[in-house]
Amino acid sequence: MAVNFPSIDPAQLHPVAGVTLGWAEANIRKPNRKDVLVVSVEEGATVSGVFTENRFCAAPVTVCREHLAKVRAGGAGIRALVVNTGNANAGTGEPGLAHARETCAELARLAGIAPGQVLPFSTGVILEPLPIERLKAGLPAALANRAAANWHDAAQAIMTTDTLPKAASRQVMIDGHTITLTGISKGAGMIKPNMATMLGFLAFDAKVAQPVLDALVKDVADRSFNCITIDGDTSTNDSFILIASGKASLPQIASTDSPAYAALREAVTSVAQALAQLIVRDGEGATKFITVTVEGGKSAAECRQIAYAIGHSPLVKTAFYASDPNLGRILAAIGYAGVADLDVGKIDLYLDDVLVAKAGGRNPAYLEEDGQRVMKQSEIAVRVLLGRGDAQATIWTCDLSHDYVSINADYRS
């Protein structure tokens, strides 16, 4: 079940000028469910993305990279995105690449744009051929359904093992101009940094130069979707896309050194973090949402390395599920994180406000009932103080329950 998942009111998902979304039921894997999404962006928008680091990347990821490379080389801008659920089109070889390109070509034909102006995305079962004819047959309905206010339907259309649609929206003022940001995400399992079995699409109406948007998407991903983990697996299809429609009155942001860029980065990061945290809250079988913060490191990289050792540990995660304050498991994870010169004699460990370990050993004042009180909460903060510098890092994770096994054992049935 989802952990303290916020209620999402479709009416509070602000339309983004220059962006429309439409969906269809194409029976990609199961009948009577939204499983195709088309996102159209008006001419003049800029689009950028980051993708999985899994070497066995899916066919649509390869095609997305190709099309964005052509844009960066001066080609025509991206005008549409197409997403299917139920089938990952991964591990499908040359036929899979042909299907991804055929999807782009068909949507381009219907929309009156070039195939290279389409980005394809797939999510679902790996190693099965994409039912391309069903997907193509669903495109006209998705195009006909397009509307600026369809963000909630769009969030439903990209779900797989998700139990709830994930969306976030906000409006901010930058240099006296209103900027609207709205995004959707999906993902519930195989969540690990770089990036997760996740798709994330975030649009805003600021006008941003292509090189600046390329920098922004990497920066934002590193502060959001690369800070979550559920089971430590990295997917073949991870994709995070930013769309800058350019319809707001704010002058174009052409430099990463400008105050406007800093303000936009803060706003985009806040929405992306909300979308990333929704994925963890809806993690497969999750019953607890856990924030792991490591402070006092020599670098943010080593802090994140230790945080992920804690967040990935099945022993730590099952202890949280059982509300068992077997917190030595956290110390063990810190120790095997791979920070070679770590002085464990300087480490303090907190569970919420409870000091569990001090100077590398059990705090004499620590009572197990205090630890168990925190472990029974649905939201828990783990804080590690390394005592070797000023850097810090935070990740978000969840516990590991019996339901996680059941969901994944039954996924293809």
Swiss-Prot record:
It is an enzyme of class 2 (transferase). The record marks 123-124 as: Involved in the stabilization of negative charge on the oxyanion by the formation of the oxyanion hole. GO terms for cellular component: cytoplasm. The record marks 196-197 as: Cleavage. Its EC number is 2.3.1.35, 2.3.1.1. It catalyses: N(2)-acetyl-L-ornithine + L-glutamate = N-acetyl-L-glutamate + L-ornithine; L-glutamate + acetyl-CoA = N-acetyl-L-glutamate + CoA + H(+). InterPro entries: Arg_biosynth_ArgJ, ArgJ-like_dom_sf, ArgJ_beta_C. It comes from the Bacteria. This is Arginine biosynthesis bifunctional protein ArgJ. The keyword Amino-acid biosynthesis applies. Catalyzes two activities which are involved in the cyclic version of arginine biosynthesis: the synthesis of N-acetylglutamate from glutamate and acetyl-CoA as the acetyl donor, and of ornithine by transacetylation between N(2)-acetylornithine and glutamate. Pfam families: ArgJ. GO terms for molecular function: glutamate N-acetyltransferase activity; L-glutamate N-acetyltransferase activity. Pathway: Amino-acid biosynthesis; L-arginine biosynthesis; L-ornithine and N-acetyl-L-glutamate from L-glutamate and N(2)-acetyl-L-ornithine (cyclic): step 1/1; Amino-acid biosynthesis; L-arginine biosynthesis; N(2)-acetyl-L-ornithine from L-glutamate: step 1/4. Substrate binds at residues 160, 186, 197, 284, 408, 413. Belongs to the ArgJ family. The keyword Cytoplasm applies. Keywords: Acyltransferase, Amino-acid biosynthesis, Arginine biosynthesis, Autocatalytic cleavage, Cytoplasm, Multifunctional enzyme, Transferase. Heterotetramer of two alpha and two beta chains. It is found in: Cytoplasm. GO terms for biological process: L-arginine biosynthetic process; ornithine biosynthetic process. The active site is at residue 197.
